């Protein structure tokens, strides 16, 4: 049985330009033919946070473009969303966009580090880590990062730690390679 839904590639080709004009790129498209009504999920990300107002605008544009297809069918659910906090950071752009949050890294040697994402430069990530009572920046080559997951925080970060992550400098800090 066919639902008349477009393929993942067709959705990306159809919506990609509209999302790019808004400053976002399509990270993934999931088409669930088994759901009733069928569901098309578009996951987008950009250098600025995908807020609810932007999601609404993108959803209206995407819905209009999808509805213009001849074979789309009468009923489907469209969902436009961001990747979510639990998405692993897998590319340089993910780290660049995630500057500031706390992250747990697993390195190629099996060691684990938890720190705050700082600047990304020349294939390396600045990670703000605790060094006794102070904060320091540790430079981590991206090639050594096996896994990186942003951590959910329930309390505000230390101001000095956050300043170091977002500006790259704070009083009483040093950079370690």
Swiss-Prot record:
GO cellular component: cytosol
Entry superkingdom: Bacteria
Compartments in which it is found: Cytoplasm
Disulfide bonds: none
GO annotation terms (biological process): ribosomal small subunit assembly; translation
Parts forming coiled coils: none
Listed CDD domains: YlxS_C (cd01734)
Chief location: cytoplasm
Keyword tags: Cytoplasm, Ribosome biogenesis
Function of the protein: Required for maturation of 30S ribosomal subunits.
PANTHER family xrefs: RIBOSOME MATURATION FACTOR RIMP
Family of this protein: Belongs to the RimP family.
Record protein name field: Ribosome maturation factor RimP
